[in-house]
Amino acid sequence: MKKIFKYMIVGLVACTTLSSCLESSLDTNPTDSMSGSGLLANANAALVPLNGLYRSMYSAWSPTDNTHQCFGISAYNLMADVMGEDMIMAAMGSGWFWYDCLYNVKSRYTATTWRSYDLWNCYYTWISNANYILDAEETMAGTETEVNYIMGQAYAIRAYSYFMLAQSFARTYKGHEDEPCCPIYVEPTVAGTEGKPRSTVLETYAQIMNDINKAVERLNGTTRKHISHIDYATALGLQARIALVMEDWATAKKSSEEAIAVSKCTIAKVSEFKGLNSVSAPNVMWGAEIISDQSGMYAGLFTHMDADADKYGAKARKQINKDLYGKMGTEDERLVWWNPKDDNNKDGGYQQEKFKFSDIQTWMGDYVWMRIEEMYLIAAEAECRLGNDAGAREYLMDLMSKRDASYSCAQKSGTSMGKLTSDYTGSLLEEIIIQRRIELWGEFGRIYDIRRLKQGFKRTAEMGWPTDALLVNRNANDPESYMWVLTIPQTEFDGNSSLDQTKDQNPVGDTK
């Protein structure tokens, strides 16, 4: 029996530039509608489907009914942040992201309106788009540099998508290499394409590394046309992220250092990127420039974050773990990212002010997906893991000198980490991770770090967590838990005869 492949190519014939893409442009057509003699005939024409693919990364394009929490990369980063201990949801509000926060989505894998289907469908849609672009390389007209620019981005998008699938539907890489991960497709898929079995974690990461290495190679020497495009520096940043999860410290160091060297971005003072809503800030490596007809309105990041806008963010306030807030010095400029004096804080944590609309009336604000500060934190961690504490401290101080004039990590050393994220050891590695938690709060997806660091965590009322979200009698303290491994959607089992639901489904509960 053949798999009736449901992942679609984004329909973008009418979308010639990022700024002209409208919501209606995101209707999907079957993958075989993209002809090599048409949109992919030459590198210049290929920018149309490529731009549309990026457009879907910040749009409420999801076929599910829960589009207000399904708006691409920023939505999934927010999802992964509320799954940890640092970003507090003070209340259920309208319900968006609340069930992620409570770990109450895995049993809903039969519905197309919940996370399992949403993430699986999203990432495989991006993979399908990338595969169609990559398949056109031999016939695509253009200079070598022009074709490399298209192909390098397609490889990077496929690498990123499989990387996020691996982080969502399998346990972390190290120690789980032989466990099942996800099916791998590297060629265009159409109705009737035979489904693949789940590859192992090791096989999936081998594909990820193969793709991101090719992306880095192909993008080197090209010039980015738009901030939403993955360029050479951004591909290096993605390579560094992947290497961290694989505990390949040498690659993490090399890639992050090269990204710092070639990106032309600089560590920015907090005052230079207020609201985290502009891709024009000097520290932004990759992001989505939002224009008025692409704001997403209620299906957008700032709607969920900016409480002053009196939208979803006011009903379900995002606040920082008080314990983490207390790790900042009195002169730390990042203190302004949270407001402990907000009258609406009540019994929760401290109200976030880090993410703000640039214009509330028009729902405006760009999405930032990678900052240069992350590269310094990766380089610091990699140096520390490699035993070079002096080098690690230097990278950390490069960042912290722009955050807190009185900061010092001179006495920190070593790599010891507590079993729980709240079990502090005082090591240099722990200090780097603490600063990472503060610096990237709301941007990266905290649960991904908790997984790769193999720590458990807890939520307490003292941190500011509401009673309903304390995760009582759950396995959050066990780093080997399946609590944060999503179930595969029922639609995949219904359409893919290579999968056996009795053997291939991930545990619905916290343990296997």
Residues covered by each model-derived region:
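Extended ligand-binding clefts on enzyme/binding-domain cores
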Residues: A43, Y58-T67, E203, M246-E247, ...
